[in-house]
Regions:
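Eukaryotic intrinsically disordered, low-complexity regulatory linkers and tails enriched in Ser/Thr/Pro
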Residues: 1-16, 20-99
Length: 99
């Protein structure tokens, strides 16, 4: 299965991008998770904004977790959506759901 069948959404679901379009993922000092897209004029999408979620920061390797999940799902059959969620008991997590 190719990465075009894997999609990544913002935490509020307002934007969804193809995982194959992502060329980089980062986390800044505020805990914002951003994805840099390979087309356009250096477009970025903020996937998680912990400031609006009462300042709960994601784990320091949260952006690496996304890369790992995309790699795993790229070999799976079917189409998937990955999105960050803030769980009160467990903090920030990546939720994966079939499409």
């Amino acid at each position: 299965m190719d990465a075009p069948y894997v999609w990544v959404a913002k935490d509020d679901g307002s934007d969804i991008v193809r995982a194959a379009a992502i060329i980089g993922v980062g986390i800044d000092y505020n805990g914002n998770i951003t994805a840099r897209l390979g087309h356009g004029e250096g477009a970025t999408v903020t996937l998680a904004n912990p400031g609006k979620e009462h300042g709960v920061h994601p784990p320091k390797d949260f952006h690496r977790q996304l890369i790992r999940i995309i790699a795993e799902l790229s070999d799976a059959s079917g189409a998937f959506l990955i999105r960050p969620v803030l769980d009160e008991a467990h903090g920030w997590q990546w939720l994966t759901e079939p499409l």
